[in-house]
Amino acid sequence: MQIGKYSLGDPIAAIATALSPAALGIVRTSGEGAIDLASAIFSKPKKLKEAQGNSILHGWVLDPESKKEVDEVTVCVYREPKSFTGEDSVEFICHGGTAVVLKIYRLLIENGFRAAEGGEFTFRAFANGKADLTRAEAVNEIINSKTDINIELAAGRLSGNLFSGIEEIKHELTAVIAAADVEIEYPEDEETSQGAFSPDLILRIIEPLKDLADSWAAEKIFIQGAKVVLAGKTNAGKSSLFNALLKEDRAIVSDIHGTTRDWLEASLNFNGIPVSLYDTAGIRYTQDSIEAIGVERSLEMSRNADLILYLCDPKDILSAGSLNKDDSEFIKNAKAPVITVITKEDLLDTESKEKIKEILKAEKIAEPIIISSKASNGIKALSEKAYSVLAKNTGSSGFSKTASLGSERQRDAVQKALDVLQTAYQNSLEGFPLDLIVEDLEEALSFLGEITGEVRSDDILDKVFSGFCVGK
């Protein structure tokens, strides 16, 4: 059976672990006849063929042609329907050397298995009713998780909280459609139809659906991450802060102006938000053509940032009694939220710090975070402030612990359902014929079905599973 680019039933095999030296490697199989086919390369073929589901065997992988031992392995046996894919399945757990993992995989391919497509195991779990699309997508979320919060969000969807939330809304929407159908079928039977349908019934569905749509805005930054740019004039301390946040010496630190001529990138997280952090060239006019390119890149990256940490040298502010005009204009005109960071805190006394705060307040710039990258003072406060700004910018200070969305695809489907329901609600208030309103309600129900996979197309399935790695 063929669904989109995937077929069902035929035996497939894939390497499920990274191809690099490791303690263990896993080669997995699934499909009709998988147990019998796998027994052809196992030292105890009869035991494997007769093994019960959810059992483990110990033995060797043998090359059927040369009869030579390949590796000592543990074999996990699953019988349909009680497996991840819902099919018979065998997994070989071997030593994790690249050559031995590839050898076992090639032996399986030579003995009747087909190479699996990316995401094909999870697709089969979906097609065989072992998981809906929200759970299938959650599998990929967990694989790609970068922080504990990523894992927590994905685990909630994997456990079925989004599926349950959608099913509850679909149940309520189905009841509204049924109520409208009663009035359509029995317009003159007051005892049967009167009061069965009202616009308020639609409104009661719109509200939780709005909350669900809003959950993506609040959560996507925890899933997709944020782009945080360190900006400021030369020698403001950007590279020192870059190193301090990473807790390693990645960027060259020098008193020479224009040392950083291009951007550096590193990954970290601010209290659970995955961040791509960029150290950029100092912003200044320069006749050095190479440095000028770096400056332009700094400005471009700042325009595309989710958050800018704009660094200022306190000596310049104190000596001038004001913030440099270019710095002030950058902070006030930036498209992204800006946290003003005053560096070299270890060189400032209390009076100087308060003076700087007063100067910035007079120029209507939010209170800065004052740090010392050298002494690590203020770094924690800066990280917490960055988290607060990034989370607030999504419209939430955290994330939903109940049903919540985990992908753009899910958000788009919810928004389409919401748009149709709002139209239906408005039309019902204006007295449109009920049969037209029911058409809108049924369309909304179809959009919600796309989220769980109850309503599906090849395009939807390709969109969901194309991002999966081979072996999952």
Curated annotation (Swiss-Prot):
InterPro entries, sorted: G_TrmE, GTP-bd, GTP-bd_TrmE_N, GTPase_MnmE, MnmE_dom2, MnmE_helical, P-loop_NTPase, Small_GTP-bd
Binding site for Mg(2+): S239, T260
Start and end residues of each TrmE-type G domain: 225-391
Subcellular location: Cytoplasm
Location (main, coarse): cytoplasm
Binding residues for K(+): N235, S254, I256, T259
Naturally occurring in which organism (per UniProt): Treponema denticola (strain ATCC 35405 / DSM 14222 / CIP 103919 / JCM 8153 / KCTC 15104)
Protein name: tRNA modification GTPase MnmE
Family membership: Belongs to the TRAFAC class TrmE-Era-EngA-EngB-Septin-like GTPase superfamily. TrmE GTPase family.
Subunit structure as annotated in this protein's UniProt entry: Homodimer. Heterotetramer of two MnmE and two MnmG subunits.
Top class in the EC scheme: hydrolase
A GO molecular function held by the record: GTPase activity
Keywords: Cytoplasm, GTP-binding, Hydrolase, Magnesium, Metal-binding, Nucleotide-binding, Potassium, tRNA processing
